[in-house]
Amino acid sequence: MGCRCCKMIQSYLFDPVQVPSPGFVNEVNNCKLEEDDTVRLKGTQNSEVEVPGSTLHSGSLSKPDSSGSTTGLPCQGSLTQEDSEERPCVEKHGIVNGIRPTATLQSVRSPRPQQVDSVSWASSPWVATIDSAHPAQPFLEGEDYRKQSCMLPTLEGTQMVGHGDSRAPAEALAVADHIPYIPAPDYPQVWSPEVDNVNPEEKDCLFENHSEVEPLPGIHPRVSQQGLSMPFSLKRSWDSLNEAGTTEVLSVYFKEEDPTQPTPVADPGNEREDPHTYNGNKEGAVVDEDAEVAEALAALEAATAGEDADDAD
């Protein structure tokens, strides 16, 4: 089985720390030997462990009971030289039970208890890694310590993700470099300042249309036209327009009633007169239109008077 297993057991006796093996289920972390177990350590190079025959198991290690009973140690008979020679052969292949020695030291220090059979535990190269991370280094020899120091630099380049899934940090950097960059749109946005500054007159066309509408004289806008939901400034503009329209209509009527204005000659038999309508916004235009209408009415009445005279004859 080799000296590493003995050193591991010795480290568990003096300073038990939860150090599971990567990729395996190890239940040896909570293992404690009772006083009746006879353990004899011989040297540091060729140490042996004597365990009573009642604790030997042919299968994997079992989980210790909650009452603190003894747990079988990974021992399958006496340690021979053939077993020690087979162990380096297994380590040269680099793969133990389908798991490569590329897992990191972080997974070795995870506190989750795991199980492992005695053969795979003995042939696993992670025993040296556990010993290097364990505080019981005075029991290590110079040769084993050099092997462990050579193994640690190969593990620093990888990191553990999840359970047994290792990824290199270079892959993460490569993925970060390939993130697609989305350029800014070249077309103007809906509410961008460029669109607002294109034509500021169109922006306020709604309010300008309300302010430019002028009501007819004498006709007050309805409540729906004034709008109960209109802002206060627009309501004031409606009131001012109504007042201006009424004053303008009164001034036009006063000018029409002036005696200096030429009056049409009307037939007493036909006293029909068209009411004057509001056809303009300025006083000069209204007066000119009234004069033209009066002349047209006079000519029409003269023609109708001649026809009436012919009918009388």
Curated annotation (Swiss-Prot):
Annotated signal sequence range: none
Key words of the record: Cell membrane, Membrane, Phosphoprotein, Tumor suppressor
Main location as per UniProt: membrane
List of residues that carry Phosphothreonine: 104
InterPro entries with a match to the protein in the record: DUF4699
Localization terms from the record: Cell membrane
Entry GO terms, CC: cell periphery; plasma membrane
Positions with biased composition (Polar residues): 70-81
Region annotation (Disordered) ranges: 42-95, 253-288
Sites of Phosphoserine modification: 60, 107, 237, 240
Pfam name, any one: DUF4699
GO biological process terms on file: regulation of cell cycle
Quaternary structure annotation from Swiss-Prot or TrEMBL: Interacts with KEAP1; this interaction prevents the ubiquitination of KEAP1 by TRIM25, thus protecting KEAP1 from degradation. Found in association with PDCD10 and members of the STE20 kinases, such as STK24, STK25, and STK26.
Function: Acts as a tumor suppressor. Acts as a tumor suppressor for colorectal cancer cell proliferation by targeting KEAP1/USP17/ELK1/CDK6 axis.
Name by which UniProt lists this protein: PDCD10 and GCKIII kinases-associated protein 1
Species name: Rattus norvegicus
Lineage of the species this protein comes from: Eukaryota, Metazoa, Chordata, Craniata, Vertebrata
